[in-house]
């Protein structure tokens, strides 16, 4: 061993929760990898374990506590960070011997805790970090976080109390990170935040340098600039503010993917008011029709909550009726789960669990029928598909209408070899409720 080198300390890492937390994990790991730390595959082979927790729902907290317990049992030297870290008393009560507990976005505190537990062993002769940093996603796609926090105060959500108000990154910084990812081989950028369409409001839409000019910290301006990088750009967590209309022409022009992830949560005006969400869903239907007239290939993904406190059968029927008329391409649904500290717990009496379960079943059955009709309409069409997983005879990929992890897949038979990250044209031959099947042409 060279005299300036010593054995590299090893870190085991657990990342729980949403894609935004995954980006936090990538940032922490990139920093530590640059300092010479190595990643261990198992807890018992590491010098320290970091657990990035989720604290949004009680079930997520339970999963986080279980992960911490497993790390303590298998290793015993554990640092906790993430959203649940904003409530350290609850964690310390269960696990008093943790090395450190830090809150969300506390990158420097996590790194400092690692330094204290196991100091870095620098190796000046190795380039330890790839150009795109340490990524926890496959090489061909990456999450691009453009802001932290949220200015909304939805009654079912405690994110602002965990992550604070909206803090946007300068547009130039976002674009430089995106360009770096593209140069490293990323073919798809998934734009994320707590509230993507509010991007830049805290910066008063200030301009920042980018290439030979400037770009403003504004949702549409950023989307347009990202669209010039020559890769798929997918927009997530978009609230239906009026200026969202301006991004639809970019989708029609092929600058960004014709895909809009827009969490609408419900359709009954009275439920939406209890949620403190925009309540004019009739106008929302008009806007969706307008968007589709501009961009016929638009796929809208949304999530809904059933069994919200006080939800009546009539209010639930309003949701089903709206869903049938909207004909959304991609839909997720969750029975309401109480969140400690959320205002929703006090707005109305809870809906019984058995009623929530029954409404969830009816919702999913109704949407499955819509989804199957929309999927069958694609049979015979030729679609571009990005390959996620290559196989000996059949590969698995996604169309422009499908985000990783949350949407369906396209199963691709191909006579020629394909690799993860390839974008191939596929003739669709068969459709299921959520997946498509076809052959590469």
Swiss-Prot record:
Entry keywords, A to Z: 4Fe-4S, Cytoplasm, Iron, Iron-sulfur, Metal-binding, S-adenosyl-L-methionine, Transferase
Annotated MTTase N-terminal domain residues: 9-119
Domain (Radical SAM core) ranges: 136-373
Subcellular location: Cytoplasm
Enzyme class label: transferase
Domain TRAM per the UniProt entry, residue ranges: 376-441
Enzymatic reactions: L-aspartate(89)-[ribosomal protein uS12]-hydrogen + (sulfur carrier)-SH + AH2 + 2 S-adenosyl-L-methionine = 3-methylsulfanyl-L-aspartate(89)-[ribosomal protein uS12]-hydrogen + (sulfur carrier)-H + 5'-deoxyadenosine + L-methionine + A + S-adenosyl-L-homocysteine + 2 H(+)
Residues given in the record as [4Fe-4S] cluster 2 binding sites: 150, 154, 157
Assigned protein family: Belongs to the methylthiotransferase family. RimO subfamily.
Function per UniProt: Catalyzes the methylthiolation of an aspartic acid residue of ribosomal protein uS12.
Protein name: Ribosomal protein uS12 methylthiotransferase RimO
Organism: Methylobacterium sp. (strain 4-46)
Lineage: Bacteria, Pseudomonadati, Pseudomonadota, Alphaproteobacteria, Hyphomicrobiales
Gene that encodes it: rimO
